Amino acid sequence: MEPLKFSKKGQDLIKLYGTMAIEGFDRTDNTHVEVAYSDFQLRAYRDHIRPTLIKHKISTVLDYGCGGSNWALHGFDEKTGQSAIEFFNLNNAYRYEPARDLDERQNVDCVISFDVLEHIFISDVPSVLRNMFSYTSKLLVLNVACYSAAALLPNGENAHITVRPPAWWKGMLDSISVEYPNITIFLICSPGFKNSNAYPEWSANDWESSNTFVINN
């Protein structure tokens, strides 16, 4: 596996997120949230993600930066009452959340990470992405918020510390994906709250097998 070594600032951030997990957090509207990381961020995208998981025959998933996600809990899908494991027809789902000392990282078919990368200190982004790539054998599914959060860190800064435009994230992934040519990437970027756009999925192998030198995806 690709070793994950956080910078000093990255380590300090994890401590702040750990404090938020225990004490809750303040918001920009001057309210306080008692229970942090309680949302299953993937739920809102479940109907868009399921065809991709089925297409790539995904049976095991690692939820990287899972927050409060519970893949075995019934009710993930409101219509059927199914859990996320049932809804996506998975054998197993594992979780990684350093702010809660939860680490089930292992080799899987697919790594999924929602609302995580914007919380990573910018110098640590390449290392975190390589760590994600190193655990998946088929697919990497990412959702990145490209806007400031309502949540505040305990030091008063915005919780979305690395806010960059979608093209920045696409370029970052393009650069790193050549090191993992067999992995397909499905990137969703959110320029605003409840405003998301998905890039067509791609892999570096797709580029190599193209009949042209100009690559447009």
Predicted regions and their residues:
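Conserved N-terminal segment of class I S-adenosyl-L-methionine
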Residues: M1-D109, P126-L129, Y135, C146, ...
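Hydrophobic adenine-recognition pocket in adenosine-nucleotide-binding enzymes
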Residues: V116-H119
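Short glycine-centered segments of the SAM/dcSAM-binding site in methyltransferase folds
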Residues: K138-V141
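A conserved beta-strand element that flanks and buttresses the S-adenosyl-L-methionine
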Residues: I112
